[in-house]
């Protein structure tokens, strides 16, 4: 069946223009006006933005191994509801995808249950234990890249050797940067809120010192090196300088780090606990500058669901991580676009073209590409209500936030995988 998307304002990477889109066999066949509608199903996008499907570089599906937190089915449906047609799944699973055999377990679960395209990462070290590097040569090309997310690679020479080998394969290293020797039992940012309320803090140096180390290795080796969930202003300056020096370095920003700071923590609640933590207002201002000047390459949610019990133990005792797939667009549109910090075009670029470039995959509403599309209503007012989430995880710092703009339909490879029910 052929499908034509009509009357939408289509994002082409630079601007929103009135175009129609012909879809057949899961691919975009034509883009333009006056397309032949004979025998076509019609999707009327009047009054809506039509963008390439969003791409999330950083998602925890928790499956296999931790299905009490999330499953491939629930996580990918949350992605669809958020407008994401491609998600990259982190490897802190059981089994960890650290060998072809273990990777196949993840691929089989994705094949069975995913409603959007899910690309798994393999780990950098066996079992994410930081002791022995994986067989990169046996895994490259079968995964999105390599990450020990949830942990930083503590040994510098081990990371350097990983980059040397990945550079030869043109494989991506996606790094959670955290020097464990600097954590000192902290669980929120070492800043004003922690001081006022007697909480143990995590210093920003635990992030940026490891980024400084790795950026030097990236420049030396030529490896594609991506920094996960940047939270500190110093990290952004290191990335900025590394790019200027010619390193193949990129970085991502989460919605919560872009919109919140430590002083937004509203009481001793686990929904404000994530890693890295919400940092200072000064760090948030630096993030805005990085979003505007191109230092930051992509938004990524770091969607990290946990059970209600695991998030009910307050700031000190709760598991680290919040959900983000279903709230990303409305909170970013409300908090950045409506306040004049970013244009709608820049926001869309960082949810589509930016992360696609990091991965090295095609992006754009152009003939020959996958028909992965998100339909957006910019005007509707809503309130974040975790009871409506498809995700099994309900912990969000944006609970109760009034938002403007929402995803109304998601099409993945030509198939509607989400349509709003209201």
List each model region and its residues:
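Histidine/acidic residue-rich metal-binding segments in metalloenzymes
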Residues: 133-299
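Histidine-rich, glycine-flanked metal-binding segment
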Residues: 1-52
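C-terminal cap of metal-dependent C-N hydrolases
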Residues: 8, 314-317, 370-422
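Divalent metal-coordination and catalytic microenvironments
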Residues: 8, 21, 26, 47, ...
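His/Asp/Glu-enriched, well-ordered alpha-helical/loop segment
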Residues: 196-224, 271, 292-293, 297-299, ...
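Active-site mouth loops of central-metabolism enzymes
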Residues: 57-70, 93, 119-132, 199-204
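A glycine-rich helix N-cap at a beta->alpha junction
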Residues: 108-124
């Amino acid at each position: 069946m052929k499908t034509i998307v009509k009357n939408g304002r289509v994002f082409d990477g630079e601007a929103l223009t009135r175009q129609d889109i012909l879809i057949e066999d899961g691919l975009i066949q034509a883009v333009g006006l006056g397309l032949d509608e004979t025998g076509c199903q019609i999707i009327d996008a009047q009054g809506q933005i039509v963008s390439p499907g969003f791409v999330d570089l950083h998602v925890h599906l928790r499956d296999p191994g931790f299905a009490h937190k999330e499953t491939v089915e629930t996580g990918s449906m949350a992605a669809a509801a958020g407008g994401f047609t491609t998600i990259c799944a982190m490897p802190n699973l059981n089994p960890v995808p650290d060998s072809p055999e273990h990777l196949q377990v993840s691929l089989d679960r994705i094949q069975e249950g995913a409603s959007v395209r899910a690309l798994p990462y393999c780990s950098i070290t066996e079992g994410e234990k930081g002791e022995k590097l994986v067989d990169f040569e046996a895994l490259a090309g079968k995964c999105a890249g390599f990450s020990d997310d949830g942990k930083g690679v503590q040994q510098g020479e081990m990371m350097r050797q990983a980059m040397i080998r990945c550079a030869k394969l043109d494989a991506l290293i996606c790094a959670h940067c955290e020097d464990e020797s600097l954590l000192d039992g902290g669980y929120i940012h070492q800043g004003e809120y922690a001081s006022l309320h007697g909480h143990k803090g995590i210093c920003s140096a635990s992030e940026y010192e490891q980024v400084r180390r790795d950026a030097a290795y990236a420049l030396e080796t030529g490896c594609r090196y991506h920094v996960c969930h940047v939270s500190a202003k110093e990290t952004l300056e290191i990335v900025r300088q590394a790019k200027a020096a010619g390193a193949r370095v990129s970085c991502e920003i989460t919605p919560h780090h872009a919109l919140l700071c430590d002083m937004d923590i509203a009481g001793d609640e686990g929904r404000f606990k994530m890693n890295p933590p919400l940092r200072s207002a000064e760090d948030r201002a630096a993030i805005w500058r990085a979003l505007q000047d191109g230092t930051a390459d992509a938004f990524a949610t770091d969607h990290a669901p946990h059970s209600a019990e695991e998030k009910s133990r307050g700031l000190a005792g709760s598991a680290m991580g919040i959900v983000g797939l279903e709230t990303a667009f409305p909170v970013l549109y409300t908090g950045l676009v409506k306040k004049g910090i970013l244009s709608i075009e820049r926001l869309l670029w960082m949810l589509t073209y930016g992360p696609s470039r990091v991965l090295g995959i095609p992006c754009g509403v152009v003939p020959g590409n996958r028909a992965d599309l998100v339909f957006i209503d910019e005007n509707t007012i809503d309130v974040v209500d975790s009871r409506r989430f498809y995700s099994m995880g309900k912990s969000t710092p944006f609970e109760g936030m009034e938002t403007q703009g929402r995803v109304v339909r998601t099409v993945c490879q030509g198939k509607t995988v989400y349509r709003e029910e209201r």
